[in-house]
Design a protein with these regions (language model features):
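N-terminal glutamine amidotransferase
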Residues: 1-174
Length: 174
């Protein structure tokens, strides 16, 4: 009938079909990433930040969410403790107001969960979770709850100039 033996019924060659299949797989992967990773991240950041969060504070909460997500993935190997140390600078809290806000939390010599220290113009927050018995995700759930309920962090992140760096850890106990 004069057709190329490598052509399919739709006039596509085997190579064309392979390229189309590869493109469909790439599209499927992109759709999964959007639905299960990016939109989940948006929901988690919204949950951490709360409904009254300023647009400028969202980047700080995104930093925390990315760390929590990474800790969640690491904990699959085993879990008994996790923590984050969040450094924040560029806040607009005056010295007197900051002293009042720190009255109950500052200067903890053991730097326990919920502790805050002031270093120059920077704030240093620590959140820790540890349990000998529990389920995967318990530690980051506790960390998320602590961060979500931290009024001082929320206030400091409201400044458009606020910036965040974070160091996180999990202990693999397998």
């Amino acid at each position: 009938d004069g057709r190329d033996p490598d052509e399919g019924a739709g006039g596509l060659t085997a190579d064309d079909l392979e390229r189309a299949n590869a493109d469909l797989i790439t599209l499927k992967d992109a759709m999964w990433t959007i639905a299960h990773d990016r939109l989940r991240t948006v929901r988690e950041v919204e949950s951490l930040a709360g409904p009254e969060a300023s647009p400028s504070s969202l980047s700080g909460y995104l930093v925390a969410q990315q760390a929590f997500s990474a800790i969640d993935r690491l904990e699959v190997r085993g879990r008994d403790s996790a923590g984050v140390h969040l450094y924040l600078w560029g806040h607009d809290i005056g010295a007197d107001a900051l002293a009042t806000l720190l009255a109950e939390r500052g200067h903890d010599p053991l730097f326990q969960s919920g502790s805050v220290e002031v270093f120059g113009d920077s704030l240093s927050f620590v959140y820790k979770a540890a349990a000998e018995i529990g389920e995967l995700g318990d530690n980051t759930a506790a960390l998320r709850a602590a961060l979500r309920s931290d009024a001082l962090l929320r206030r400091a992140l409201q400044a458009p100039t606020a910036r965040v760096a974070l160091l996180g850890h999990t202990r693999w106990a397998s």
